Amino acid sequence: MGAEKITSKIVEDANKNAEKILAEALNEKEAILTEAKEEASKKEQAIAKKGEKDAEMTKNRILAEARLSAKKKLLEEREKTIQLTLEKLEEDLVKLPQKDEYKDTLLKLIISGVYSVGGGELELLLNKKDFEVIDDSTLWALEKEMEDRLKKVTVLKKGEAKSIIGGCIIKTADHTKVSDNSLEATFERNLDSVRAKIAEMLF
């Protein structure tokens, strides 16, 4: 499952919670404005003797402050919803290697990494469990596929096991080029676009 599909699924789940949170925020907004109108009305009456202009100014000031407070509350709830969705996305990211489709995702990340550094003699770094997923026959097939695509001899040598959730890190033999396609690095690189997508889908 690609990052976009994963994000879409999590956002879909989060949308239910978002609707509830936003409904509560809107109710609170209405309560703030209602209370402000009542307060403004009372103060307007209290200072009516001082003149209609002063009363109107006081009323407008109170209502403006209430609108600002309500808007701030909505923005806070919106940010909270986005943050909760991101946290859920990170939780699902940790679970991704347990899913049936993970091997396909891992292969795509490896291919992307090989493209990024330009092929040649490369070092493949995975976590311990993923080295079991990518056996020698799979590695050989990857090398052949990349040679055909890049028109360049490509050798993938297994390096040391890394403490990563999943995904891969590809290095050239001289370590001058590195492509970090670990799941966590990929998530961090796409964090801004993921936030924007969540906001677009939820709001």
UniProtKB/Swiss-Prot annotation:
Topology in the lipid bilayer is annotated as: Peripheral membrane protein
GO CC field = plasma membrane; proton-transporting two-sector ATPase complex, catalytic domain
Main subcellular location: membrane
- Name the Gene Ontology molecular function terms of this record: ATP binding; proton-transporting ATP synthase activity, rotational mechanism; proton-transporting ATPase activity, rotational mechanism
The annotated subunit structure for this chain is: Has multiple subunits with at least A(3), B(3), C, D, E, F, H, I and proteolipid K(x).
Q: Which UniProt keywords apply?
A: ATP synthesis, Cell membrane, Hydrogen ion transport, Ion transport, Membrane, Transport
What family is this? Answer: Belongs to the V-ATPase E subunit family.
Q: Which InterPro entries match?
A: ATPase_E_C (IPR038495), ATPase_V1_Esu (IPR002842)
State a single Pfam family of this protein.
Answer: vATP-synt_E
Question: What gene name is given for the protein in this entry?
Answer: atpE
Top-level taxon of origin: Archaea
Chain's role: Component of the A-type ATP synthase that produces ATP from ADP in the presence of a proton gradient across the membrane.
What is the name of the protein in this document?
Answer: A-type ATP synthase subunit E
Under PANTHER family, the record lists:
ATPASE H+-TRANSPORTING V1 SUBUNIT E1A-RELATED
| Entry's Gene Ontology BP terms | proton motive force-driven plasma membrane ATP synthesis
Q: What does the UniProt entry say about where the protein is found?
A: Cell membrane
